[in-house]
């Protein structure tokens, strides 16, 4: 399992944002799923992502990720407007598994409200990650 970036924040639903919780509101953040999620899902074969301009709400479903094992809802860890979608994942879904905290990012949001976010240590502890 990949190391959790310490400068990211995490949701209980296994999404990450590339910012700390205290610096989120008013900024644009990238969002993806964690290595814990990709390990549990297995090989990702499809992702339905929100569209640019969509409003997402923290804790609400905004897409889904399909793997060889199951289909899982994608939840937004923040509230705001989608400003970009990583079209590259549609060309190669394996990047979500291979680089979940880098090239496997899913979408970007201009944040108006943060949800309940955890530090890397809190997320690791809650999910039994060393």
From Swiss-Prot:
Keyword Zinc: no
Positions bearing N6-lipoyllysine: 69
Gene3D superfamilies per the UniProt record, alphabetical: 2.40.50.100
Cofactor binding remark: Binds 1 lipoyl cofactor covalently.
Cofactor: (R)-lipoate
Gene Ontology CC: cytosol; glycine cleavage complex
InterPro entries associated with the record: 2-oxoA_DH_lipoyl-BS, Biotin_lipoyl, GCV_H, GCV_H/Fam206, GCV_H_sub, Single_hybrid_motif
Family listed: Belongs to the GcvH family.
Oligomeric and partner information: The glycine cleavage system is composed of four proteins: P, T, L and H.
Role description: The glycine cleavage system catalyzes the degradation of glycine. The H protein shuttles the methylamine group of glycine from the P protein to the T protein.
Protein name: Glycine cleavage system H protein
Native source species: Corynebacterium aurimucosum (strain ATCC 700975 / DSM 44827 / CIP 107346 / CN-1) (Corynebacterium nigricans)
